Design a protein with these regions (language model features):
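Beta1-alpha1 glycine-rich phosphate/pyrophosphate-binding loop at the start
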Residues: 23-93
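FAD-binding core/adjacent interface of flavoenzyme oxidoreductases
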Residues: 19-28, 44, 49, 56, ...
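Short, positively charged and aromatic/hydrophobic N-terminal segments
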Residues: 7, 14-15
Length: 164
């Protein structure tokens, strides 16, 4: 078993500079959908690469206090804790995580290879690409919307409906 420092050096060497190697599967997004895909792919013998994002990995759940409607947590779970657990489970099954933002995706129509470039300059290639970038709230930009957000203005009926 490699020591932590040996693994860190291997990761730094592997992810430094402009490189391109064919990956089994690349998953763009580190929310529940991205990590679930990574877990199932890892268990199936693939080596998924998750491009998690540089600033807000973990999706919208990292900004959620208590998640009460996720199976297996009858007393609820904090959003960041749930996402940390999902990340660890994905890594347990062989997922590699890159903390960077995707800047471009292209497809070679002849070979079917998808090329994913990230902000730090690295380039990754794959035949299978999963886009799991989630969603964002659609705001109306009307007077009082920001002021009353969470105080009567809600963006998630299944999340907040019982409050009203």
């Amino acid at each position: 078993m490699k020591s932590c420092s040996a693994r860190l050096v291997a990761l730094v060497v592997r992810y430094s500079g402009n490189m391109s190697d064919l990956r089994d599967v690349i998953i763009v997004g580190s929310g529940p959908a991205g990590y679930t895909a990574a877990i199932y792919l890892g268990r199936a013998g693939f080596n998924p690469l998750v491009i998690a994002g540089a600033l807000t990995p973990g999706g919208q759940l990292v900004n959620t206090t208590e998640v009460e409607n996720f199976p297996g947590f009858p007393d609820g779970v904090m959003g960041p804790e749930l996402m940390d657990n999902m990340q660890r489970q994905a890594e347990k099954f062989g997922a590699e995580i890159v903390w960077d933002d995707v800047v471009s995706v292209s497809n070679n129509d002849v070979t079917g290879v998808k090329t994913v470039s990230v902000d730090q300059g690295d380039v990754f290639e794959t035949h299978a690409l999963i886009i799991a970038t989630g969603s964002e709230y659609r705001k109306l930009d009307i007077p009082g919307e920001a002021e009353y957000s969470g105080k009567g203005v809600s963006y998630c009926a299944t999340c907040d409906g019982f409050f009203f």
